[in-house]
């Protein structure tokens, strides 16, 4: 059974990495990032449900 020839692997891996870097570098450098991202204020809304004030088997409103 012949041995696997790994003598060209270094050159292959190096050329693939160089090619990927060359192809992806312009895409990454052209990407625009926002200068100062600010969080959006969130507003909570009260839900009006019929069981908020009505008596049910699991809820008795405080009087």
UniProtKB/Swiss-Prot annotation:
InterPro entries: ATP8_mammal, ATP8_metazoa. One of its GO terms (molecular function) is proton transmembrane transporter activity. The chain crosses the membrane at residues 8-24. The keyword Ligase does not apply. Belongs to the ATPase protein 8 family. Subunit 8, of the mitochondrial membrane ATP synthase complex (F(1)F(0) ATP synthase or Complex V) that produces ATP from ADP in the presence of a proton gradient across the membrane which is generated by electron transport complexes of the respiratory chain. ATP synthase complex consist of a soluble F(1) head domain - the catalytic core - and a membrane F(1) domain - the membrane proton channel. These two domains are linked by a central stalk rotating inside the F(1) region and a stationary peripheral stalk. It is found in: Mitochondrion membrane. This is ATP synthase F(0) complex subunit 8. Component of the ATP synthase complex composed at least of ATP5F1A/subunit alpha, ATP5F1B/subunit beta, ATP5MC1/subunit c (homooctomer), MT-ATP6/subunit a, MT-ATP8/subunit 8, ATP5ME/subunit e, ATP5MF/subunit f, ATP5MG/subunit g, ATP5MK/subunit k, ATP5MJ/subunit j, ATP5F1C/subunit gamma, ATP5F1D/subunit delta, ATP5F1E/subunit epsilon, ATP5PF/subunit F6, ATP5PB/subunit b, ATP5PD/subunit d, ATP5PO/subunit OSCP. GO terms for biological process: proton motive force-driven ATP synthesis. Pfam families: ATP-synt_8. Keywords: Acetylation, ATP synthesis, CF(0), Hydrogen ion transport, Ion transport, Membrane, Mitochondrion, Transmembrane, Transmembrane helix, Transport. Disulfide bonds: none annotated. It comes from Physeter macrocephalus (Sperm whale). Signal peptide: none annotated. The modification N6-acetyllysine is found at residue 57. Its main location: mitochondrion. GO terms for cellular component: mitochondrial membrane; proton-transporting ATP synthase complex. It is a single-pass membrane protein.
